[in-house]
Amino acid sequence: MLEGLDGKTVFLGGGSYPGTLDYCKNENFAEKNGILTAEGALWLAQNHLERALYRSRVLVCGYGRIGRVLSGLLLAHGADVTVCSRSALSKTQALFTGARHTDFSGLEQPGDYDLVYNTVPHMIFTKRELQALRRDTVLVDLASFPGG
């Protein structure tokens, strides 16, 4: 397809080809995209969770652009949020906002969550962890390849 666009500038998300610009490499775009993704993820929960977000038990895996914003939105709605991340900094940040924290070893026992979000772009859920979730748990995978 790109061969037919000689002399044209092509914007794309993810990838590097001659004559193209990857908008995902623009930090301003990536930050705003994370906000929109988090808002969309919140909408999904509000429309598919069979209860209010208020006092729902929510696990947010990953505390990058999307995870940070999403956790804040969920906390603002009164959800009981647990953030799963690996760095000491993200743990401190999550706890400071009022969320709980677990590391990835905590995924072996996914607990009694009403809602689970994955934003980690690596495979973190095995068949065992997925089978340990309650049948009514809503799982929203927001991760990019190869984790999503």
Regions found by a protein language model. Give the residues of each.
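Short, polar loop motifs at secondary-structure junctions
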Residues: 12-19, 85-90, 144-147
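NAD(P)-binding Rossmann-fold cofactor-contacting core
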Residues: 77-97
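Rossmann-like adenosine-cofactor binding region
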Residues: 2-4, 94-148
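Active-site rim beta-loop-alpha module in soluble metabolic enzymes
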Residues: 73, 85-86, 90, 117-124
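Glycine/serine-rich phosphate-binding loop and adjoining beta1-alpha1 elements at the start
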Residues: 1-55
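Glycine-rich adenosine-cofactor-binding loop
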Residues: 52-75
